[in-house]
């Protein structure tokens, strides 16, 4: 049952068997849009063939244009985010930031999982799927920082990828994130992890002389973008 007091977001992707990926994004938004507070257009899962093709400028513009049209037809249009891959070149990030600004999206979620198996100690153990958790932390944070620089801090960013502690969350914030998402660590540790992260994060903010999270957002983006 939908609780109006809760903030509910929907991560919209495409199925492997989809015959119309672009159309499916809009169909799901139309069907669910009136019961959620925000939606994320996930074009970055490495497990769905051709899904990452939507990072290409032309295809992305077509997708976002259709999604925005359907969003505007809802009873109350909702904020739309876009979730990107960590395996992108700088020119691709620049195009994504331009499109995000052009269509006035709510923000960018950086990042999804990676297909860079060099991040693993044992590269022979995996040959498909996406890398998540701690091996992804630094790669995803670098992309986050680069997006923050390209957008000049004017586009809200959600940092995700390898966060399992207050120190990890602080890294994402300093790279440019104004919000954090968890998945892998939450699955391993459980809901108690959130309180632990918040407690550690408060201590780290105090030690570094920040009065609040907003003051720390993007404070080390140049450093992390080149690391």
List each model region and its residues.
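Hydrophobic faces of well-ordered beta-strands that scaffold small-molecule active sites
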Residues: 8-12, 39-42, 80-84, 108-110, ...
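Glycine/Thr-rich beta-alpha phosphate-binding loop at enzyme active sites
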Residues: 46-55, 93, 99-153
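Conserved hydrophobic residues forming the short capping helix/wall of the S-adenosyl-L-methionine
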Residues: 71, 151, 201, 205
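Extended, intrinsically disordered, low-complexity segments
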Residues: 137, 199-227
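C-terminal helical cap(s) of enzyme catalytic domains, especially alpha/beta-barrels
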Residues: 117-133, 186-210
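Catalytic cores of alpha/beta
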Residues: 26, 88-102, 148-153, 163-180
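Active-site entrance/lid segments in N-terminal catalytic domains of soluble metabolic enzymes
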Residues: 1-104, 117-120
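Glycine-rich phosphate-binding active-site loops on the catalytic face of alpha/beta enzymes
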Residues: 43-45, 107-115, 169-196
């Amino acid at each position: 049952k939908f609780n109006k007091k809760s903030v509910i977001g929907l991560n919209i992707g495409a199925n492997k068997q989809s015959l119309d990926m672009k159309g499916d994004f809009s169909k799901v938004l139309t069907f669910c849009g009136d019961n959620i507070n925000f939606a994320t257009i996930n074009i970055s899962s490495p497990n769905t063939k051709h899904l990452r093709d939507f990072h290409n400028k032309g295809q992305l513009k077509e997708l976002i244009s259709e999604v925005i049209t359907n969003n505007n037809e809802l009873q109350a249009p909702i904020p739309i985010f876009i979730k990107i891959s960590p395996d992108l070149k700088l020119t691709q990030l620049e195009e994504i930031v331009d499109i995000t600004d052009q269509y006035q999206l709510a923000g960018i979620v950086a990042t999804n999982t990676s297909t860079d198996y060099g991040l693993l100690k044992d590269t022979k153990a995996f040959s498909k799927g996406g890398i998540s958790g701690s091996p992804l932390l630094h790669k995803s944070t670098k992309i986050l920082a680069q997006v923050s620089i390209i957008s000049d801090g004017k586009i809200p960013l959600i940092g995700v990828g390898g966060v399992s502690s207050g120190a990890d969350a602080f890294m994402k914030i300093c790279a440019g994130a104004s919000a954090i998402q968890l998945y892998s660590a939450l699955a391993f540790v459980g809901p108690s992890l959130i309180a632990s992260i918040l407690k550690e994060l408060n201590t780290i903010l105090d030690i570094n002389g920040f009065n609040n999270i907003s003051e720390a957002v993007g404070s080390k983006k140049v450093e992390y973008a080149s690391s």
